[in-house]
From Swiss-Prot:
Record gene name: gpt
Residues holding 5-phospho-alpha-D-ribose 1-diphosphate: R43, G44, D102, D103, L104, V105, D106, T107, G108, A109, T110
One of the GO biological process terms: XMP salvage
Protein name: Xanthine-guanine phosphoribosyltransferase
Record: residues binding Mg(2+): D103
Locations listed in the record: Cell inner membrane
GO cellular component, one term: plasma membrane
Described function: Purine salvage pathway enzyme that catalyzes the transfer of the ribosyl-5-phosphate group from 5-phospho-alpha-D-ribose 1-diphosphate (PRPP) to the N9 position of the 6-oxopurines guanine and xanthine to form the corresponding ribonucleotides GMP (guanosine 5'-monophosphate) and XMP (xanthosine 5'-monophosphate), with the release of PPi. To a lesser extent, also acts on hypoxanthine.
Cited InterPro entries: PRibTrfase_dom (IPR000836), PRTase-like (IPR029057), Xanthine_Guanine_PRibTrfase (IPR023747)
Positions annotated to bind xanthine: D106, I149
Domain of life from the UniProt record: Bacteria
GO MF annotation list: guanine phosphoribosyltransferase activity; hypoxanthine phosphoribosyltransferase activity; magnesium ion binding; xanthine phosphoribosyltransferase activity
Protein species of origin: Nitrobacter winogradskyi (strain ATCC 25391 / DSM 10237 / CIP 104748 / NCIMB 11846 / Nb-255)
Cofactor: Mg(2+)
Amino acid sequence: MSAHKTPDKAFPVSWDQFHRDCRALSWRLNETGPFHAVVAITRGGLVPAAIVARELGVRVIDTVCIASYDHLHKSELKVLKGISDMTVKLGGGSGRNLLVVDDLVDTGATARVVRGMIPDAHFATVYAKPLGKPLVDTFITEVSQDTWIYFPWDLDLAFAPPLRDGAA
């Protein structure tokens, strides 16, 4: 999302739905591997990377930390932690047989940065928006560019008043 526009549509995702979607992603990726390591783009990629790594039997999990959002506002990209030298070596220096996992590709800005680090890696996301979709190799669900996905780790349970009491 741009820094000046709030999303037009909301797409809340429950833990159950997210787990199902991650398993579906794993099923698709099972035909693509084998992978020597999984690289999670943090923080959003941590949960799907853990599920995918478990399903594919991958033991080596690394992270790359690129900050691009502050709550709903997009900010300048900052690499806070790069991929370890050991993981890069496992991928032959170019990312071959490495699997990069994130929750979502939005504009593709984060994916471009990581692709620059390991260009031959396989990129997988659970959700993809049209602007970022060309940068990923495998995804499960496409959502429109004007949709904000509310992931389960970003939500809290709250009381919802009955409709008869004026709830919208």
